[in-house]
Amino acid sequence: ERQPLVANLDLLIIVTDPTGDFSIRRVERYVEALASGCDAPVVLAVNKADTVDDAETRAAEARSAIPGLDAVAISARTGTGIAELRTRWSPGDTVVLAGSSGVGKSTLVNVLCGTAAETGDLRGDGRGMHKTTTRRAYVTDDGALLVDTPGLREVGLYSEEGSAGTAF
């Protein structure tokens, strides 16, 4: 079933992690599908930088593969890169977190908002368990509206009848 992710956003943050499941092709698909038809800037947040030695390398790979992409290595657990990520929005902005299950979106919400969004353990294979099942908005401590979204299983492009001509 097709479901629009969110509307009226000012910034889209695609959250990923730098582990063995990291895929530039997935990042490209997310950027293309989620940012298509959207004037909001996109930032790739390579979360869990505290778990590997090459998180910044992954961010650089993404910047190289996707011209114009803003990418930053962060750790919601240790706070690495969080101050830099916060510079991407202003008070009153609507900021959307999107990405696969288990990449730390809800943990990032907790850091940015000082709230207690439910988080979960990873399965034995390192994948998330889809703890977030609905979109939910929070207010960051600097006054932005932060929307936490469920883990994406797949993304794609679609258009309303008659709108294909504007996309191509």
Which stretches of residues belong to each language-model region?
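Helix-rich effector regions associated with P-loop NTPase G domains
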Residues: 1-12, 16-18, 23-25, 32-43, ...
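Short amphipathic alpha-helical segments
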Residues: 25-28, 56-59, 110, 158-161
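Short, contiguous clusters of charged residues that form electrostatic/catalytic patches at enzyme active sites
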Residues: 25-29, 80-83
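Canonical P-loop GTPase G-domain recognition
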Residues: 50-103
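Walker A/P-loop
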Residues: 101, 105-107, 111
